[in-house]
């Protein structure tokens, strides 16, 4: 550990200069800035890889200052290699650090990288809320999950594809094709992952949906039409024209979303949509459930293509 800290201390000025120069260029051209995050973004842990916080201006009405956390493989700045990208989405009342503070994403990712069980990739954790700058509420009132989900077919989708994905591809050495992009999330983020991939099958080759929020409660607020209507039409086109390279669906045995997630699984199975469905021994929460599911999914990503591409 001391040797690792010595190495980081030795090279920290280089990274600071590099990021400062990079930030100036980004600010001038894209209205964005990159920072080395403080200890809070690291959750008191010293990750193997490099953590960067990217702040940028949104292109849709509403929030103007957006943030995302980018976790780079340990050798990112020591090689010319290009890497696949995993976009990891939070749930309701979440934000860009939820996977860090509650999901211990650095520890889980590092353990798999260390053992060679997962492909090195860039992990991007954006804030996909569109209510108020980087917060999951509006005017001090938490939005209901059903209100949040309606926004995926609109501002969230547009901002995610045009702001987040395009920005990441322009700033980092990615492999900018569907075979090297994954989108995954939990709860509302799990639903958003399905929907984003269905709307953009040419962009996302891998989908991970953990306990996707699909609870209507009988309300007639447009959500039923959104989910049970044209989503499956979009998925039919997706699987016919641009089939995913991997589609992973999860729900806990004591998960409030288990019945509806099983419904998605059975409907996909009837329609011949290739996917994997797994149940884990937990409920709808972080208590080992989503953390272990994340590790299971990460081991499966980017296995169908050679990701060891050079510039």
Language-model segments: residues:
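Sec-dependent signal peptide recognition
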Residues: 9-17
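Prokaryotic Sec-type signal peptides and long signal-anchor helices
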Residues: 18-19, 306
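C-terminal motif of bacterial Sec signal peptides marking the signal peptidase cleavage site
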Residues: 22-23
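Non-catalytic cap/lid and distal C-terminal segments of serine-dependent acyl enzymes
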Residues: 26-311
